[in-house]
Amino acid sequence: AIEMAEKAAEILPPFDKLTDCNGNTMFSKSTPCQGAAYALLAHLCAWKAGGKYFAAEVDRNYDEKELWDMAEKACTKVIESPLYDLVATPEEVCASVLVGNSKEGVYETVMKDYYNEVGKRVYSLGTDYVGYPVRPEYGPGVVQDFTLRIFTTSVRKMYPGADTRKYAYFYDLDGMDAMDKSITGGFAYPYKERSVNITVTGTKKKFASFNSNRIWWRLADIYLLRAECRVHLGGDKIEGAIEDLNTIR
């Protein structure tokens, strides 16, 4: 698999050079390209390096440091490409990147606007914690019935001070926190995935599915993976790992 990913990275064109059979420019991040191949290569190398001691002893005859180095270099190929860029704010992550086909996306499966054809994104972890106001059939009190939930106080500890992620990832954090605790239970309202398909029957609206692509890899993921690679490589790579983490915080 690693050899095939290396070959793909060699022969596939960059994203901006992709064309269909008629020579038309491709715009979908679901089309395999050089950047996606490097992302795949990085993950394959990292998985094999990190899983060495889970393998049978007879299958451990390889240098994991070499694989961490290969993964780090593949990550760098994606990061240094001018075709991908981090968005500026956490709000853009929610409203653009997680919806799909953004400048930060590296590879994804197109599901937005086609959920009736390719399968509903109902069956995802999001349905276990997303309620009001993403799902119009729910009121704010339903959060207390969820198995997966988080206190607003915990959110503020996770994203302290001026960190705006707490306001992008959770709906009206301050306003809902001020609401009667008999309704909210003191819990926050996840709002990271908010692009949804709604069915309407008469005057009633109901959540049908998430209306977004399946994001396999985005640039922030690649920064995070490179940081992990650099930690395993150690030495003068540690400083670079810290820089990568600070870049995507």
Regions found by a protein language model. Name each.
Residues 1-12, 27-54, 64-79, 107-109, ...:
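Extended, hydrophobic/aromatic-rich amphipathic alpha-helical segments that build helical scaffolds
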Residues 14-24, 85-90:
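Surface-exposed patches in mature extracellular/periplasmic domains of secreted proteins
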Residues 21-23, 54-63:
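Intrinsically disordered, low-complexity Ser/Thr- and acidic-rich flexible linkers and loops
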